[in-house]
Regions:
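Conserved beta-propeller blade repeats
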Residues: 2-20, 48-69, 109-110, 156-160, ...
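Conserved hydrolase catalytic core segment
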Residues: 232-243
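Cap/lid segment of the alpha/beta-hydrolase catalytic domain
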Residues: 45, 69, 82-88, 92-219, ...
Length: 246
């Protein structure tokens, strides 16, 4: 449903319209050829979870070339020069990780779990490929769920520092954000705010049920408005958590 899609922006060129949107907590880019009226999604790679972006080259709207940005939880930021007409791309810039980085060492999963009222909530899980899924790992579960802010699954070198130590990083795309459109935000604000808290608690329970971790081994994390979330969930379900960062 369109009410579960967030339009992030539109870029107009002489021959093309580029639309960015978010649905099911996944960021996407679509390109429409104005002369043929054909629209296609720009597919960056075989990764399911990533963050795309687009910028004009010298603000030239007569061009067929644009800069495309790309990153994912396991792939550092990259910038490509992309030709919309022949679909060729050239790598222009790539984020350097001084300590070295091999994206194949990491596994990124996108799952959904049922919350207290049956709504399906997206969850992004990033872990080292050597981390065992037997309930022994600690999980850092990040959440925000406020002001319609979506938690895009981008790259973070500091996050990988934890993941390299066998800590699983999970981001719960809970209600109050706009990962599933305007309705997702409205279902997590004002008198519906309890949905934000319940979504997060059910994310923790899902991670325990699926043996990513065990009860009492989850570190909850949320800052600013996410601090309200942390205060609520640790008081509602203290047995789930090893600690709270806020």
């Amino acid at each position: 449903a369109k009410e579960e899609v967030l339009i992030g922006g539109l870029t107009f060129l002489k021959n093309w319209i580029i639309r960015s949107e978010t649905s099911e907590a996944l960021d996407k880019l679509f390109v429409k050829n104005i002369s043929t009226n054909i629209e296609e999604e720009l597919i960056f790679s075989d990764e399911t979870v990533y963050v795309p972006g687009v910028n004009l080259i010298q603000k030239d709207r007569n061009t067929d070339e644009v800069y495309l940005g790309y990153s994912s939880p396991k792939t550092p930021s990259r910038v490509f020069k992309y030709n919309l007409s022949n679909k060729s791309k050239e790598l222009i810039k790539e984020q350097e990780i001084p300590s070295g980085h091999n994206k194949d060492d990491y596994i990124v999963e996108r799952v959904e779990f049922k919350s207290h009222d049956g709504r399906l909530v997206p969850l992004t899980i990033t872990r080292h490929k050597k981390t065992k899924i037997n309930g022994s790992a600690n999980v850092l579960l990040y959440g925000y769920g406020s002001y319609g802010n979506s938690m895009s699954p981008s790259f973070s070198s500091t996050r990988l520092s934890l993941i390299n130590r066998d800590i699983i990083w999970a981001t719960a795309h809970i209600r109050g954000g706009m990962e599933k459109g305007m309705k997702w935000w409205k279902e997590g604000k004002l008198t519906n705010k309890k949905n934000t808290f319940e979504d997060y608690i059910y994310a923790a329970k899902y991670l325990i049920e699926k043996n990513y971790t065990s009860k009492g081994n989850i570190i909850g994390m949320g800052g600013s408005a996410g601090g309200l979330l942390m205060g609520a969930v640790v008081n509602q379900s203290p047995e789930l958590f090893l600690g709270i960062i806020m």
